[in-house]
Protein backbone atom coordinates (compact mmCIF):
# COMPACT_ATOMS: atom_id res chain seq x y z
CA UNK A 1 0.00 0.00 0.00
CA UNK A 2 2.85 2.36 0.88
CA UNK A 3 4.52 1.62 -2.47
CA UNK A 4 1.28 2.45 -4.32
CA UNK A 5 0.88 5.68 -2.37
CA UNK A 6 4.47 6.72 -3.10
CA UNK A 7 4.01 5.92 -6.79
CA UNK A 8 0.81 7.99 -6.95
CA UNK A 9 2.45 10.93 -5.20
CA UNK A 10 5.42 10.73 -7.53
CA UNK A 11 3.21 10.60 -10.60
CA UNK A 12 1.19 13.56 -9.34
CA UNK A 13 4.37 15.57 -8.80
CA UNK A 14 5.49 14.85 -12.36
CA UNK A 15 2.12 15.96 -13.75
CA UNK A 16 2.11 19.16 -11.68
CA UNK A 17 5.69 19.95 -12.69
CA UNK A 18 4.88 19.48 -16.36
CA UNK A 19 1.81 21.71 -16.03
CA UNK A 20 3.93 24.43 -14.44
CA UNK A 21 6.41 24.50 -17.33
CA UNK A 22 5.82 27.23 -19.96
CA UNK A 23 4.37 25.72 -23.09
CA UNK A 24 6.13 26.38 -26.38
CA UNK A 25 4.11 28.64 -28.65
CA UNK A 26 2.39 26.65 -31.40
CA UNK A 27 4.18 26.75 -34.73
CA UNK A 28 2.68 29.22 -37.20
CA UNK A 29 3.14 29.60 -40.94
CA UNK A 30 2.88 32.97 -42.66
CA UNK A 31 3.47 34.47 -46.10
CA UNK A 32 5.23 37.81 -46.49
CA UNK A 33 5.46 39.83 -49.69
CA UNK A 34 8.98 40.41 -50.97
CA UNK A 35 10.55 42.45 -53.78
CA UNK A 36 13.78 43.16 -55.62
CA UNK A 37 15.89 45.48 -53.47
CA UNK A 38 19.38 43.98 -53.55
CA UNK A 39 21.46 43.25 -51.59
CA UNK A 40 18.77 43.33 -48.89
CA UNK A 41 16.00 41.54 -50.78
CA UNK A 42 15.91 39.58 -54.04
CA UNK A 43 14.59 36.30 -55.40
CA UNK A 44 17.89 35.17 -56.92
CA UNK A 45 20.14 36.38 -54.11
CA UNK A 46 21.65 33.93 -51.60
CA UNK A 47 19.10 33.52 -48.77
CA UNK A 48 16.83 35.99 -50.64
CA UNK A 49 19.10 38.80 -49.44
CA UNK A 50 20.34 40.21 -46.13
CA UNK A 51 17.06 41.57 -44.78
CA UNK A 52 15.03 38.57 -45.97
CA UNK A 53 17.33 36.19 -44.11
CA UNK A 54 17.21 38.22 -40.90
CA UNK A 55 13.41 38.26 -41.00
CA UNK A 56 13.21 34.50 -41.52
CA UNK A 57 15.75 33.77 -38.79
CA UNK A 58 14.07 36.05 -36.24
CA UNK A 59 10.65 34.52 -36.85
CA UNK A 60 12.12 31.00 -36.74
CA UNK A 61 13.38 31.65 -33.22
CA UNK A 62 9.78 32.25 -32.18
CA UNK A 63 8.33 29.19 -33.93
CA UNK A 64 7.07 30.95 -37.07
CA UNK A 65 7.82 29.60 -40.56
CA UNK A 66 7.98 32.24 -43.29
CA UNK A 67 7.36 31.87 -47.02
CA UNK A 68 8.00 34.73 -49.46
CA UNK A 69 5.80 35.80 -52.35
CA UNK A 70 7.46 38.21 -54.77
CA UNK A 71 5.70 41.24 -56.24
CA UNK A 72 6.70 44.29 -58.31
CA UNK A 73 7.78 47.14 -56.05
CA UNK A 74 4.55 49.12 -56.27
CA UNK A 75 2.43 46.07 -55.32
CA UNK A 76 4.60 44.69 -52.53
CA UNK A 77 3.31 46.89 -49.72
CA UNK A 78 -0.23 47.02 -51.10
CA UNK A 79 -0.49 43.22 -50.92
CA UNK A 80 0.11 43.45 -47.17
CA UNK A 81 -2.21 46.42 -46.67
CA UNK A 82 -5.16 44.64 -48.28
CA UNK A 83 -4.54 41.24 -46.66
CA UNK A 84 -3.52 39.37 -49.81
CA UNK A 85 -0.52 38.21 -47.75
CA UNK A 86 0.03 38.18 -43.99
CA UNK A 87 2.57 40.99 -44.10
CA UNK A 88 5.72 42.37 -45.65
CA UNK A 89 9.04 43.90 -44.56
CA UNK A 90 11.55 46.63 -45.34
CA UNK A 91 9.11 49.50 -44.71
CA UNK A 92 9.30 52.72 -42.71
CA UNK A 93 6.22 53.79 -40.74
CA UNK A 94 3.90 56.55 -41.89
CA UNK A 95 0.49 57.57 -40.47
CA UNK A 96 -1.18 56.30 -43.64
CA UNK A 97 0.53 52.90 -43.47
CA UNK A 98 -0.29 52.52 -39.77
CA UNK A 99 -3.99 52.58 -40.63
CA UNK A 100 -3.65 49.14 -42.25
CA UNK A 101 -0.47 47.69 -40.74
CA UNK A 102 1.15 46.75 -37.44
CA UNK A 103 4.87 47.54 -37.18
CA UNK A 104 7.55 45.52 -35.43
CA UNK A 105 10.81 46.84 -34.02
CA UNK A 106 13.15 47.96 -36.85
CA UNK A 107 15.39 45.23 -38.26
CA UNK A 108 17.92 47.40 -40.11
CA UNK A 109 18.30 51.04 -41.11
CA UNK A 110 18.78 52.34 -44.66
CA UNK A 111 21.15 55.26 -45.25
CA UNK A 112 19.26 57.33 -47.82
CA UNK A 113 21.38 59.50 -50.12
CA UNK A 114 21.00 61.21 -53.48
CA UNK A 115 22.72 59.74 -56.52
CA UNK A 116 23.75 62.20 -59.23
CA UNK A 117 25.73 62.40 -62.47
CA UNK A 118 29.41 63.09 -61.89
CA UNK A 119 29.33 66.10 -64.18
CA UNK A 120 26.29 67.70 -62.51
CA UNK A 121 26.55 67.94 -58.72
CA UNK A 122 23.83 69.38 -56.47
CA UNK A 123 25.27 70.49 -53.10
CA UNK A 124 22.82 71.26 -50.28
CA UNK A 125 22.61 72.02 -46.57
CA UNK A 126 18.84 71.75 -46.38
CA UNK A 127 16.54 69.96 -48.81
CA UNK A 128 14.99 73.32 -49.67
CA UNK A 129 18.37 74.18 -51.27
CA UNK A 130 17.50 71.68 -54.01
CA UNK A 131 14.81 74.00 -55.27
CA UNK A 132 13.45 72.94 -58.66
CA UNK A 133 15.75 69.91 -58.93
CA UNK A 134 14.12 67.06 -60.84
CA UNK A 135 14.11 64.16 -58.39
CA UNK A 136 13.32 60.59 -59.41
CA UNK A 137 10.81 58.82 -57.18
CA UNK A 138 9.89 55.13 -57.21
CA UNK A 139 6.14 54.48 -57.01
CA UNK A 140 5.10 53.22 -53.56
CA UNK A 141 8.24 54.34 -51.73
CA UNK A 142 8.40 56.83 -48.85
CA UNK A 143 11.36 59.21 -48.65
CA UNK A 144 10.81 60.87 -45.23
CA UNK A 145 8.40 63.48 -43.89
CA UNK A 146 10.85 66.28 -44.72
CA UNK A 147 11.14 65.11 -48.32
CA UNK A 148 7.35 65.16 -48.65
CA UNK A 149 7.17 68.66 -47.14
CA UNK A 150 9.67 69.95 -49.69
CA UNK A 151 7.71 68.36 -52.54
CA UNK A 152 4.48 69.89 -51.24
CA UNK A 153 6.18 73.29 -50.99
CA UNK A 154 7.32 72.99 -54.60
CA UNK A 155 11.02 72.93 -53.73
CA UNK A 156 11.51 69.41 -55.11
CA UNK A 157 9.99 68.26 -58.39
CA UNK A 158 9.16 64.52 -58.24
CA UNK A 159 9.39 62.41 -61.39
CA UNK A 160 7.78 58.99 -60.95
CA UNK A 161 9.05 55.63 -62.21
CA UNK A 162 7.93 52.04 -61.49
CA UNK A 163 11.27 50.84 -60.07
CA UNK A 164 14.72 51.92 -58.93
CA UNK A 165 16.63 50.70 -61.99
CA UNK A 166 14.38 52.75 -64.28
CA UNK A 167 15.14 55.80 -62.16
CA UNK A 168 18.88 55.15 -62.44
CA UNK A 169 18.53 54.90 -66.22
CA UNK A 170 16.67 58.21 -66.26
CA UNK A 171 19.42 59.76 -64.15
CA UNK A 172 22.08 58.51 -66.54
CA UNK A 173 20.13 59.91 -69.51
CA UNK A 174 19.75 63.32 -67.85
CA UNK A 175 15.97 63.07 -67.55
CA UNK A 176 16.22 63.62 -63.78
CA UNK A 177 18.87 65.40 -61.69
CA UNK A 178 18.87 63.33 -58.50
CA UNK A 179 17.65 59.95 -57.32
CA UNK A 180 17.20 59.13 -53.60
CA UNK A 181 18.01 55.55 -52.59
CA UNK A 182 19.88 53.62 -49.91
CA UNK A 183 23.63 54.00 -50.48
CA UNK A 184 24.35 50.26 -50.63
CA UNK A 185 21.33 49.44 -52.79
CA UNK A 186 22.18 52.18 -55.27
CA UNK A 187 25.78 51.05 -55.64
CA UNK A 188 24.69 47.42 -56.00
CA UNK A 189 22.12 48.19 -58.70
CA UNK A 190 24.52 50.37 -60.68
CA UNK A 191 27.31 47.78 -60.60
CA UNK A 192 24.99 44.98 -61.74
CA UNK A 193 22.86 46.78 -64.32
CA UNK A 194 25.29 49.04 -66.19
CA UNK A 195 28.52 48.52 -68.06
CA UNK A 196 31.52 50.07 -66.23
CA UNK A 197 31.79 52.94 -68.73
CA UNK A 198 28.22 53.96 -67.82
CA UNK A 199 28.35 53.06 -64.13
CA UNK A 200 31.27 55.42 -63.56
CA UNK A 201 29.12 58.33 -64.71
CA UNK A 202 26.94 58.04 -61.59
CA UNK A 203 27.94 58.71 -58.00
CA UNK A 204 26.31 58.99 -54.56
CA UNK A 205 26.51 62.12 -52.48
CA UNK A 206 28.36 61.57 -49.20
CA UNK A 207 25.69 63.18 -47.04
CA UNK A 208 22.55 61.23 -46.18
CA UNK A 209 19.22 63.05 -45.99
CA UNK A 210 17.49 60.36 -43.92
CA UNK A 211 18.29 57.19 -42.00
CA UNK A 212 15.21 55.05 -42.64
CA UNK A 213 14.10 52.33 -40.20
CA UNK A 214 13.17 49.07 -41.95
CA UNK A 215 10.36 47.21 -40.20
CA UNK A 216 8.34 44.03 -40.64
CA UNK A 217 4.66 44.89 -41.10
CA UNK A 218 1.64 42.68 -40.44
CA UNK A 219 -1.86 43.23 -41.83
CA UNK A 220 -3.75 45.03 -39.06
CA UNK A 221 -6.86 42.84 -39.47
CA UNK A 222 -4.84 39.60 -39.14
CA UNK A 223 -6.38 37.64 -36.25
CA UNK A 224 -2.91 36.84 -34.93
CA UNK A 225 -1.38 40.19 -35.83
CA UNK A 226 -0.33 41.37 -32.35
CA UNK A 227 1.01 37.89 -31.55
CA UNK A 228 3.10 37.84 -34.74
CA UNK A 229 4.56 41.25 -33.92
CA UNK A 230 5.41 40.10 -30.39
CA UNK A 231 6.95 36.86 -31.63
CA UNK A 232 9.07 38.67 -34.18
CA UNK A 233 10.33 41.23 -31.68
CA UNK A 234 11.24 38.44 -29.28
CA UNK A 235 13.06 36.48 -32.00
CA UNK A 236 14.89 39.58 -33.22
CA UNK A 237 16.15 40.35 -29.72
CA UNK A 238 17.34 36.76 -29.30
CA UNK A 239 19.15 37.01 -32.62
CA UNK A 240 20.85 40.25 -31.60
CA UNK A 241 21.72 39.12 -28.06
CA UNK A 242 23.31 35.89 -29.31
CA UNK A 243 25.63 37.66 -31.74
CA UNK A 244 24.06 35.75 -34.65
CA UNK A 245 22.57 38.94 -36.07
CA UNK A 246 25.94 40.46 -36.97
CA UNK A 247 27.29 37.14 -38.24
CA UNK A 248 24.29 36.66 -40.55
CA UNK A 249 24.56 40.21 -41.91
CA UNK A 250 28.27 39.83 -42.68
CA UNK A 251 27.91 36.35 -44.19
CA UNK A 252 24.88 37.20 -46.33
CA UNK A 253 26.33 40.52 -47.51
CA UNK A 254 29.49 38.75 -48.68
CA UNK A 255 27.45 36.08 -50.48
CA UNK A 256 25.18 38.69 -52.11
CA UNK A 257 28.10 40.82 -53.29
CA UNK A 258 29.78 37.74 -54.78
CA UNK A 259 26.62 36.88 -56.73
CA UNK A 260 26.13 38.53 -60.09
CA UNK A 261 24.55 37.93 -63.48
CA UNK A 262 26.15 39.01 -66.76
CA UNK A 263 25.25 42.58 -67.70
CA UNK A 264 23.44 42.95 -71.00
CA UNK A 265 25.20 45.05 -73.62
CA UNK A 266 24.16 48.70 -73.47
What are these regions (language model features)?
Residues 68-129, 140-143, 203-208:
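Acidic, polar ligand-binding/catalytic clefts
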Residues 74-86, 102, 129, 165-192:
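Short helices/loops that flank or line small-molecule/ion binding pockets
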Residues 113-123, 211-226:
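A bilobed periplasmic-binding-protein/Venus flytrap-type ligand-binding module shared by bacterial periplasmic
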Residues 39, 45-57, 118-153, 167-169, ...:
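Bilobed "Venus flytrap"/periplasmic-binding protein-like clamshell domains
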Residues 78, 91-99, 178-200, 207-210:
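A ligand-binding cleft/hinge motif common to bilobed small-molecule-binding domains
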Residues 55-64, 105, 129-131, 140-162, ...:
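Ligand-binding cleft/hinge of the Venus flytrap
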Residues 52-61, 215-248:
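Extended ligand-binding regions for polar small-molecule ligands
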Residues 24-95, 99, 251-255:
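Extracytoplasmic small-molecule ligand-binding "clamshell" domains
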Amino acid sequence: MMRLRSWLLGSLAVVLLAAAQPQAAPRLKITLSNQEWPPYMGKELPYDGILSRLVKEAFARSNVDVAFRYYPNNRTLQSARNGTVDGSFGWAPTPERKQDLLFTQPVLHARMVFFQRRNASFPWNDLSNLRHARVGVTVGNFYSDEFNRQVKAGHLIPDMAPDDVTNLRKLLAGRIDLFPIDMEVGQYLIARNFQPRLAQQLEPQNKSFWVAPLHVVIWRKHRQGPELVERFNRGLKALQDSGEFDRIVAETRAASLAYHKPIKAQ
